[in-house]
Amino acid sequence: MGSRLAPCRRFGKCDGRMASQYSPPPRHEPVFNLPSAVVWLLAVLVLIQAGRSLLSDYDDYVLMSWLAFVPARLTLWLSPGRLDDVVGAMAQSTAGQDVADRLHLVRLLLADGGVRLWTLLTYGFLHGSWLHLVSNAVWLAAFGSPVARRLGPGRFLNLMALATIGGALLHWWSRDLDVLPLVGASAGISGATAAAVRFVFAPGLRFGDLGDDAVVRAIPAEPLGQLWRNSRALLFIAVWFVTNILFGAGLVPIFGEETSIAWEAHIGGFVVGLLLFPLLDRGQQRR
């Protein structure tokens, strides 16, 4: 069986070291063959969601106020004079709620005047519901796994973190007066998805190959200029953008969810992943 030599034949030249690396006979792979970085990240997300489920509603909201990203906080830190604008926007977004609830929201999210810059990252560890977490977990396992195999744990987590921050910043830019907390790992996962687009649509690549570290690292990554000539990659990107915009605009209902989709954060994370992937990539590059 020559399956271990496949990446050399399909994706480039092999020297003696690479040939020996790919030469071991095939072994039985587990059904869920996830990289350790993905497994540990999923475990952390599940443990956080489980821990929050044990908190009272008030304590959970306090936790959210410290870890979720609130665009209006960053706006007031940068432009303190826009307090009236924030209050007006909050009155519109919380219309129909009790006045006491509004005051409670202001006290928790805005009263201390702190910007809490760490929330640009920590919001990615929180989720609105178990369904929200499960949907993100499935997407992370599918698209984060090949990226984690190619980059290694450290670079993969750095990419996720940068995409998470990029998603928060684009969300803030588009909704700078919003007092509603932003939560979810979707921006980071969108960044990993964009990174995967740079190499998973290589000609001749089979889906089963993405479970092999050596194969994934041997696939030449598409330069951004050439990516637009890859019809499969372009189709995926188009479907991804259209789907996110439709869900974000509320044109397509979200089963079991009452919250809206922060599609701007998804797009911000996707763009960061697409652009920064080459800086972190340690695999083959297509010339």
Located regions from the model:
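A detector for small-residue-rich transmembrane helices and their helix-helix packing motifs
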Residues: R10-R287
